Amino acid sequence: MCRLPGTTEPYGQAMLSAAEHERLLSVLPTAWHPALSHGRIERVRSGMSAASVFQVGASHFLKIAQGPDAHDLRGEIDRTAWLGHQGVRVAPAVKVHAAGDLVAVLSEALAGSSADETDLPAETVVPALARALSALHAIPVRDCPFDESVAVRLGRAGVLVESGLIDPGVFASRNRDVSPAALLERLRTRKPDEQVAVVHGDATLSNLIVGNDRSVAFIDCGHAGRADPYTDIALVIEGLAERFGSGAVDGFMHAYGGPALNERKRDYFLDLYELF
């Protein structure tokens, strides 16, 4: 996680103090200062990302990453831009800065609310998400330069498990008595047949922004790439079932189109996400 120069603590969890604001400006180009010198700047939840995330007024978000995490943010910027060029609704980058081991991006805020917090009813949200994911998964995969296959994800998971960075205490109840190493081995030996599509890669409801016009946008796109569609489908239907009840799963699959729900793949990709 990026830290303010001269401190050992992460950025403030609410509105930045004047001193924190000055330290934030000190790591960014002077050309950025006018955009960051007026209005409220708040630290916000960053989800799975190791980057520090700030809301700048009502119109922009700022992400900063330093050290090893900077590479991941650079990848997120590239993948988000690629999706945007394919016509996918994403948060447009206004400014990008990369110097030394620090990367920062200032992006436009998107109209709407995340699918886990929207006030829109299930009969609006469920088909909207299904249509958005179906369209994303229909992008020609040959044009996508980013590999997020099971092999790639298992390799990444192996590093995390070996480094002791996976907390089994947050595993779902079905894996409550399974160690990270045992779960990894199970995933390695029970790989499903993979289909390949362009996926978001971290499609929790918090990363899907639903507008009042029923449009859907994608944020936190650092794991977008070529992968099995169930990389996304499993997470979305799990979130919809928790938010709206099990009937939302049938509604999603009907609106998404294609074959009936593959429960084996759903379970596999939910388990793989435990090591994400």
Tell me the role of every PLM-derived stretch.
Residues A70, E123-V126, D177, A181, ...:
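Short, structured helix-loop boundary elements
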Residues A19, G258-F276:
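Charged phosphate-binding loop/patch that engages nucleotide di/tri-phosphates or the phosphate backbone
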Residues R45-L62, A182-T231:
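Active-site acidic catalytic loop and adjacent metal/ATP-binding pocket
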Residues A70, V150, D193-V198, G211-R264:
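Active-site Asp-x-Gly
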Residues E20-H33, A135-G201, A260-N262:
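An alpha-helical support segment within catalytic cores of ATP-dependent transferases
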Residues R43-F146:
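ATP-binding pocket architecture of kinase catalytic cores
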Residues C2-G39:
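Juxta-kinase regulatory segment immediately upstream of eukaryotic protein kinase catalytic domains
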